[in-house]
């Protein structure tokens, strides 16, 4: 997996420009691990977060949707010998998390894809996070541009945190802003972002 420099830009922009007046706990690079999120869940601390924002790689397995994942630091090999996890937080593992978040944002490629099954509906990460306790989940429907994602997420959270907008209203407004912007106007940059409520 290649590095995503925009994720650090994204996290820094959220910390410095959006979440300045609320409690904020940042886990980046080595601390952003599958092992860490599972430990937070097991201890009950993950349930204390009203927003869980994961800026990382996403993986969709078209042959076996249950293997679709959010990818953490272990995948890079940087935590070899430190973590027993493989770095792939799969759909079954996600559904077992202990969440009570108003928003889980998967700022990663292909996190909104799933497999539609008769009698079950869509098997995918959005549903797994909702089963785990998230009230809403923001995802992407395809591979997304790193820089555009950082800009989209920063604007979206600013509208929610600073302007008091709902998440759905913030998503609509940021998409409209992107459409009107010469740099971000192409649907590739904004249309992938959807919100499940």
Enumerate the predicted regions with their spans:
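Catalytic cores of enzymes
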Residues: 1-197
């Amino acid at each position: 997996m290649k590095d995503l420099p925009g994720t650090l830009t994204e996290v820094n922009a959220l910390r410095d420009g959006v979440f300045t007046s609320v409690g904020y706990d940042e886990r980046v690079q080595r601390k952003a691990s599958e092992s860490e999120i599972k430990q937070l869940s097991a201890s009950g601390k993950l349930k204390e977060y009203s927003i869980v924002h994961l800026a990382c790689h996403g993986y969709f397995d078209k042959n076996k949707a249950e293997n679709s994942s959010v990818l953490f630091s272990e995948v890079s090999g940087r935590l070899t010998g430190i973590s027993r996890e493989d770095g792939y937080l799969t759909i079954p593992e996600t559904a077992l998390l202990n969440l009570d978040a108003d928003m889980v944002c998967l700022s990663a490629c292909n996190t909104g894809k799933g497999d539609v099954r008769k009698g079950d509906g869509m098997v995918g990460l959005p549903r797994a996070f909702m089963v785990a306790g998230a009230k809403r989940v923001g995802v992407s429907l395809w591979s997304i541009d790193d820089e555009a994602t950082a800009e989209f997420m920063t604007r979206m959270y600013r509208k929610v945190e600073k302007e008091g907008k709902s998440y759905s209203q913030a998503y609509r407004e940021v998409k409209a802003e992107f459409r009107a912007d010469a740099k971000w106007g192409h649907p590739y940059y904004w249309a992938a972002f959807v919100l499940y409520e």
